[in-house]
């Protein structure tokens, strides 16, 4: 068998690319040319993106990469993992990633977001979600960092809420949006939205 041959497989709609020259494996949806990101639901008071192949971080410090992969997969119809993103960026799995790392990774996968050094306004949250663009959220707690993907919003009784995908728990939460600092609970700590990667305008 020629070990220098590039081998591709298509399994149940997933195109698994095994490049034996580099020893890397990547995955993408075979019919992504026809893929269009969709909303889970839309109404006058709620808009939620229907996430596609959302990713967890596993046992590693890959929340940043899993959040990037979740956004990229929804936008592009792919099936990248957190490890795929970290490998492409050349970052070790337990090193963690900065806002700049996440923004660059998104851009490399064709999701042209900017690094924004604060929590974005409610107007900008709505604008991004309305355009089917989940938001990369970097939060802090006692000097530590954690990343999630914001993929929806709603208004109920004049209160504003955001939907987030947490790669640490591989689950969705709905939390109150607060102009002074949106918070969420994870791993027995309270985390505050600190930085953002999104379309800025």
Language model: regions and residue ranges:
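Active-site-adjacent structural segments surrounding the nucleophilic cysteine of cysteine proteases
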Residues: 1-93, 141, 156, 196-201
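Conserved active-site-adjacent core of cysteine acyl-enzyme catalytic domains
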Residues: 4, 8, 18, 84-201
């Amino acid at each position: 068998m020629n070990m220098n041959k590039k081998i591709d497989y298509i399994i149940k709609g997933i195109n698994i690319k095994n490049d034996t020259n580099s020893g890397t494996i990547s995955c993408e949806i075979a019919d992504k040319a026809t893929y269009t990101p969709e909303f889970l639901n839309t109404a006058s008071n709620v808009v939620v993106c229907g996430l596609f192949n959302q990713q967890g971080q596993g046992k590693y410090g890959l929340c940043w990469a899993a959040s990037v992969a979740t956004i990229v997969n929804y936008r592009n119809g792919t099936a990248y993992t957190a490890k795929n993103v970290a490998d492409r960026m050349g970052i070790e799995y337990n090193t963690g990633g900065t806002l700049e790392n996440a923004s660059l990774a998104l851009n490399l996968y064709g999701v042209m977001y900017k690094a924004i050094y604060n929590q974005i306004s409610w107007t900008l949250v709505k604008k991004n979600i309305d355009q089917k663009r989940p938001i990369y959220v970097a939060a802090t707690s006692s000097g530590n960092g954690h990343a999630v993907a914001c993929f929806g919003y709603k208004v109920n009784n004049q209160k504003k809420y955001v939907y987030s995908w947490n790669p640490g728990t591989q689950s969705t939460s709905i939390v109150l949006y607060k102009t002074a600092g949106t918070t969420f609970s994870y791993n027995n700590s309270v985390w505050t939205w600190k930085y953002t990667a999104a379309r800025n305008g």
